[in-house]
Design a protein with these regions (language model features):
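Extracytoplasmic/secreted envelope proteins and their assembly/folding machinery
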Residues: 51, 65, 97-100, 113-116, ...
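Soluble non-cytosolic domains of exported or imported proteins
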Residues: 90, 94, 106, 110, ...
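Acidic/His/Gly-enriched intrinsically disordered linker/tail segments
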Residues: 72-75, 162, 229-245, 252, ...
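Sec/Tat-exported extracytoplasmic proteins
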Residues: 72, 103-107, 123, 178, ...
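Juxtacatalytic substrate-recognition/specificity segment
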Residues: 163-281, 382-392
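N-terminal secretory signal peptides that target proteins for export/translocation
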Residues: 1-6
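Compositionally biased alpha-helical segments
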Residues: 23-171, 175, 182-203, 208
Length: 406
């Protein structure tokens, strides 16, 4: 349950279904072939059984699925590539090069470079790989670019003591600077991409999620001491005003990555990309991040697995230890502000109850309750997430809400 930095403004989010036509500009990397043979170019940002949403410039055009014969989309290729990655070992250079070639063929140049870097870690003297990655030979050494300098490949990781010399690599949806070494950089990028697709799989059926067309900046520091100063010993946070995720490396992994990546995805997918009009309530902001983090099993670096339900044992333990007369009421949870989550007093119980309420409504066995919660999400994203909206929507189910704490 990572703390958020003090005095950060709450970010704005808007569900795609409520978004204006103007959106993030996207290069025309995709093709949609109609049944009459006409071919349209743009970026496929969403498709389902009923329609294909094609972004041309900054305008999203809905095309009825019955009019579409073929769709050639980067998003689909990226999902396929990530599936292949899940079954491959990063210690197998042959497998990594096979993935790199697949990425090349499918128009995913950033991923192609990532897999070649994985291969190079196993074959550090491979001339062809060094040349493909743009490294330069200097005598018997190979020099790689770190910031505005070139340093020997075998000493590059050690340069991370200075964040200015951090590795900087791209993936389809993320732009990462990492001072914790090349392998951690690669694993973190693939972890983030896995989380991106898991986020869409987890919530895409209920909330219309569009493809992200702008990379999210992420900074991973060598340790907490290297991080920019914030109030308290904060190990991870997302800053909406900089549209950047900040975290550090702990035990070889990026700390609280899923929680903060959720904040980043919400902001970039809805607020930043679609010029949001509504403010997501603080309880929902944090609860959503905790719910998604609980739905990920992250045992293998770079390969998160999406679970059917959100699992947060620490929150369950916290709830079990709170006396009944000390539990916050549903009304109080709905009225929690960002500062309430930042305060150390009762912090664990606030996160636990927010997560429990989200989980109770999102995963309820009653389809009507789940549908009502989706309705609330849409209204909250449109700037109508006040507790009065929640109470009105859930009035028929009010007596059931305290069951969330059980």
């Amino acid at each position: 349950m990572p703390a958020r930095p003090a005095q950060l403004p709450p970010f704005l989010v808007c569900l795609a279904a409520l978004a204006p036509a103007m959106a993030q500009s996207a290069p025309p990397r995709d093709r949609v072939v109609l049944v009459d043979g006409k071919e349209l170019r743009g970026r496929v940002v969403h498709e389902d059984a009923n329609e294909v949403l094609l972004r041309v410039g900054t305008t999203d055009k809905a095309i009825a699925r019955k009019l579409v014969r073929e769709v050639h989309a980067v998003a689909a290729h990226h999902r396929e590539l990530l599936q292949q990655w899940r079954g491959s070992s990063p210690e197998d250079p042959v497998a990594m090069l096979r993935l790199a070639r697949q990425a090349d063929e499918q128009g995913l140049p950033h991923e192609a470079r990532l897999f070649r870097w994985y291969a190079l870690l196993q074959r550090p003297d491979d001339v062809e790989l060094h040349n493909a990655l743009g490294n330069r030979r200097a005598g018997k050494q190979w020099l790689v670019a770190l910031g505005d300098k070139r340093v020997p490949f075998d000493r590059a990781d050690a340069m991370g003591v200075d964040f200015a010399a951090a590795w900087r690599l791209r993936s389809e949806h993320f732009d990462l600077r990492c001072a914790a070494g090349l392998r951690t950089t690669l694993d973190t990028l693939l972890e983030l991409e896995g989380q991106y697709h898991a986020f869409h799989a987890a919530y895409g059926d209920a909330v219309r999620l569009l493809e992200l067309c702008e990379p999210i900046p992420v900074h991973v520091y060598r340790d907490r001491a290297q991080m920019p100063q914030q109030s308290g010993a904060i190990g991870a946070y997302y800053k909406p005003d900089e549209a950047t995720l900040f975290t550090c490396c702990e035990n070889g992994r990026a700390y609280a990555l899923a929680h903060e990546a959720t904040h980043a995805l919400l902001h970039h997918t809805f607020g930043r990309a679609l010029r949001a009009k509504g403010e997501l309530p603080a309880w929902l902001d944090e609860a959503w991040a905790e719910h998604f983090a609980g739905r990920l099993q992250t045992r293998v670096p770079g390969k998160p697995v999406l679970l059917d339900r959100s699992v947060q044992p620490a929150h369950r333990t916290t709830l079990a230890q709170i006396a009944a007369d000390e539990l916050l009421t549903v009304q109080r949870v709905l009225n929690l502000q960002q500062g309430d989550f930042q305060a150390s007093t009762g912090q664990a119980s606030k996160y636990a109850q927010a997560w429990a309420l989200f989980t109770f409504l999102c995963e309820h066995d009653d389809a009507a309750i789940r549908a009502t919660f989706v309705d609330y999400l849409r209204q909250a994203a449109a700037g109508k997430g006040q507790s009065s909206t929640f109470r009105k929507l859930f009035a028929p189910h009010e007596r059931l809400l305290p069951d969330a704490w059980r």
